């Protein structure tokens, strides 16, 4: 451990997919003393089923399997867009995902590429960090959920939070998934800062 790190004051903060990481890590690593999961992915397969129409799901699974077989056979790595206009295939198929990534790419991240590997999507679907959410306790756990989140659905996050043990705190902020980053930044950042300060600075 680096000398500037206080091992008794290690806190984790994650948002969206990285929230999955902090949930999983804090369930098993007691060095973590406080954790905040913002607009979290809690169960990738359940989440994916919300984003893909039921009648298209078997074809999507077959497409992922075909990509895997093709990669093993040819070594070729295939890509798909992270976001795309409605009706086109993308890893994050919600309208607010398209709006946010497109705007952010233009204004704040001009070198960002709108692509990810198909294999990454398939592997991500195996991720179920909330299966172990009950093991986070006694580490203080805060979950920040957007009231109208359609990318990492609000009800999935709240259900996972219900299975966590004390000490815990649920914060519900107005808006959708991406409001936590811009329009609703203060409503998300302030409780997170207070939670980390309360449990790491005492």
Regions found by a protein language model. Give the residues of each.
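Alpha/beta-hydrolase-fold catalytic nucleophile elbow
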Residues: 13-15, 36-39, 174
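Conserved alpha/beta-hydrolase "acid-adjacent" motif
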Residues: 145, 150-156
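Gly/Ser-rich "nucleophile elbow"/oxyanion-hole loop immediately N-terminal to the catalytic nucleophile
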Residues: 1-11, 15, 32, 67, ...
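Gly/Ala-rich beta-loop-alpha elbow adjacent to hydrolase catalytic centers
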Residues: 14-18, 22
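Catalytic histidine-centered segment of alpha/beta-hydrolase-like enzymes
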Residues: 175-189
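Alpha/beta-hydrolase-fold enzymes
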Residues: 21-101
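Short beta-strand/loop motif that positions the catalytic acidic residue
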Residues: 136-137, 143-145
């Amino acid at each position: 451990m680096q000398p500037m790190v206080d091992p008794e004051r290690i806190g984790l903060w994650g948002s969206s997919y990285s929230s999955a990481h902090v949930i999983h890590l804090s369930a098993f690593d007691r060095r973590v003393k406080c954790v905040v999961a913002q607009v979290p992915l809690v169960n990738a397969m359940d989440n994916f089923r919300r984003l893909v129409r039921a009648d298209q799901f078997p074809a999507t699974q077959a497409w992922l399997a075909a990509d895997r077989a093709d990669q093993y056979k040819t070594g070729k790595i295939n890509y798909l867009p992270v976001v795309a206009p409605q009706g086109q295939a993308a890893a994050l198929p919600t309208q607010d995902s398209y709006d946010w990534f497109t705007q952010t790419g233009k204004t704040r991240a001009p070198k960002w590429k709108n692509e990810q590997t198909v294999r990454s999507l398939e592997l991500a679907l195996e991720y179920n960090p909330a299966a172990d959410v009950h093991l986070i306790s006694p580490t203080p756990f805060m979950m920040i959920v957007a009231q109208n989140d359609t990318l990492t659905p609000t009800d999935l996050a709240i259900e996972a939070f219900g299975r966590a043990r004390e000490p815990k705190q649920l914060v519900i902020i107005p808006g959708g998934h991406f409001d936590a980053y811009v329009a609703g930044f203060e409503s998300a950042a302030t409780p997170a800062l207070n939670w980390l300060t309360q449990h790491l600075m005492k």
